[in-house]
């Protein structure tokens, strides 16, 4: 009989072990056996909680997406300035939060993006994440710009966030958060300046 209250603990152990395994050997070589060993559990526990490796990857991505959402939400809740600029900066900062730019998270995101092209459940997660980012950016830009300019600015800033993140992930070095923030801030300020132009 399973111990009461163990499910959340086991799931968390396995998600963190997945992040560690992907960081160490990549998604392709992150076997169920390796993940179980890193989590200190038997292989069968993964099947019990997640069915298979794809289920575990989906749960791991939901964990990262939840951390991303929390990082953005906390920054926006702490704002004293309700301007579109302040909200846009908070969204950018949340996307470059340490929970998203540490080595294990970055490698897992890269594996997720590649796998999402072939797995419908992961593709749905990716689409939801893309839509959420675009929608939040567009709403804030729309507070100050025309609808067409707001949509274009939101697409541009979303692409810039993803591009800065991807280039940072592929360097193999520690992510330069300050540089990424400064580039993104400069872009959003240029877009917001169109109101008076």
Swiss-Prot record:
Keywords: DNA-binding, Repressor, Transcription, Transcription regulation
InterPro entries linked: BetI_C, DNA-bd_HTH_TetR-type_CS, Homeodomain-like_sf, HTH-type_TetR-like_transc_reg, HTH_TetR, Tet_transcr_reg_TetR-rel_C_sf, Tscrpt_rep_BetI
DNA-binding region listed in the record: 31-50
A Pfam family assignment: TetR_C_6
Annotated pathway: Amine and polyamine biosynthesis; betaine biosynthesis via choline pathway [regulation]
Matching Gene3D superfamilies: Tetracycline Repressor, domain 2
Keyword Transcription regulation appears in the UniProt entry: yes
Domain HTH tetR-type: 8-68
One GO BP: glycine betaine biosynthetic process from choline
One MF annotation (Gene Ontology) recorded for this entry: transcription cis-regulatory region binding
Superkingdom of this protein's organism: Bacteria
Keyword Mitochondrion listed: no
Function: Repressor involved in the biosynthesis of the osmoprotectant glycine betaine. It represses transcription of the choline transporter BetT and the genes of BetAB involved in the synthesis of glycine betaine.
NCBIfam families according to UniProt: betaine_BetI, PRK00767.1
Protein name: HTH-type transcriptional regulator BetI
Organism the protein comes from: Pseudomonas aeruginosa (strain ATCC 15692 / DSM 22644 / CIP 104116 / JCM 14847 / LMG 12228 / 1C / PRS 101 / PAO1)
Gene expressing this chain: betI
């Amino acid at each position: 009989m399973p111990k009461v209250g163990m499910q959340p603990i086991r799931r968390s152990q396995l998600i963190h072990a997945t992040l560690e395994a992907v960081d160490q050997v990549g998604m392709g070589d992150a076997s169920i056996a390796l993940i179980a060993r890193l989590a200190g559990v038997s292989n069968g526990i993964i099947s019990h909680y997640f069915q298979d490796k794809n289920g575990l990857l989906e749960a791991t991505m939901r964990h990262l997406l939840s951390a991303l959402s929390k990082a953005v939400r906390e920054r926006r809740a702490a704002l004293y300035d309700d301007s579109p600029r302040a909200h846009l900066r908070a969204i950018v900062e949340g996307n470059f939060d340490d929970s998203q730019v540490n080595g294990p998270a970055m490698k897992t995101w890269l594996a997720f993006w590649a796998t999402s092209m072939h797995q419908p459940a992961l593709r749905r997660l990716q689409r939801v994440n893309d839509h959420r980012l675009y929608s939040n950016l567009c709403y804030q830009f729309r507070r100050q710009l025309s609808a067409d300019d707001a949509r274009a600015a939101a697409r541009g800033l979303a692409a810039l966030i993803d591009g800065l993140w991807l280039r940072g992930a592929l360097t193999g070095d520690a992510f330069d958060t300050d540089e990424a923030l400064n580039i993104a801030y400069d872009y959003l300020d240029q877009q917001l300046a169109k109101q008076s132009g």
